[in-house]
């Protein structure tokens, strides 16, 4: 992987355990969504773009990025893979 652009490596090879979550839209605010999948409610931080895409839907699939730190495990949800990749470039 010598000389490979670090950003390209991040976007194409990120090591998420969860690629996406499909489930019932249980709660929705402009900054967070709760998707229930198989009895588990996943709280995801979302963008206004994803919020707009979810409005009025009872079920959805969100692509996920997991931020795992010593003091917190945070999930970010995105309406599209492209939105997630853009987030990873920031």
Show where each model-derived region lies:
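Intrinsic disorder/low-complexity segments
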Residues: 1-16
